[in-house]
Amino acid sequence: MVRVMATGVFDIIHLGHIHYLRESKKLGDELVVVVARDSTARKNGKVPIFDENSRLKLVSELKPVDRAILGHEDDMMKTVVEVMPDIITLGYDQKFDEADLKRKLDQIGVNSRIVRISKYDGNLNSSSMVRKKIMELIGERF
C-alpha cells in the first residue's frame, strides 16, 4: 500500500485545494492530509479564517481524503514520522525547498519521495486570490 501525505493550511477550501488533493491521491492508495495548526499558519504569515479544528473537519469530509490529522506545532518531522509516507506531495505554491526537505527526511531515516503538484488552471486557485476577490467585491458594494 502506497501512502501519500499532503500538507497545507486549507483555509477557504477552493478548486486549487481539490486539484492538489485529487492529484495527490492518484499517486497512491491512501491519502493522509496534514492540516496546519493555527499557530503554524500564523508563523508563516497566514491568519486563518477557520480555526484548526474546523479546517480539519472540512478536509476530512473531502472525497480524495482517507485520513486528516493536525500537524505538530513545533516540529513538522514528528508528523512525518507518525505518518511514514511513501510520497510527500507539495502544492505548487508551498514554500518548501525540496532539497532541504529531502535532507531532513534522510536525517530521520525516512525515505519518502517528494512530488510537487502542478498549479490548477482555473480562476481563484489560491486562498490569497479568493481573499483578494472577496475584498474587491466588498469594495464595489461600499
Swiss-Prot record:
Q: Which UniProt keywords apply?
A: ATP-binding, FAD, Flavoprotein, FMN, Nucleotide-binding, Nucleotidyltransferase, Transferase
Q: Does the record bear Lyase in its keywords?
A: no
Cofactor(s) recorded for this entry are: a divalent metal cation
Q: Name one Pfam family in it.
A: CTP_transf_like
Signal peptide residue numbers? none
Annotated catalysed reactions:
FMN + ATP + H(+) = FAD + diphosphate
Report the Gene3D superfamilies cross-referenced here: HUPs (3.40.50.620)
EC number(s): the record gives 2.7.7.2
Family, similarity comment: Belongs to the archaeal FAD synthase family.
Q: What does this protein do?
A: Catalyzes the transfer of the AMP portion of ATP to flavin mononucleotide (FMN) to produce flavin adenine dinucleotide (FAD) coenzyme.
Q: What is this protein called?
A: FAD synthase
Organism from which the protein derives:
Thermoplasma acidophilum (strain ATCC 25905 / DSM 1728 / JCM 9062 / NBRC 15155 / AMRC-C165)
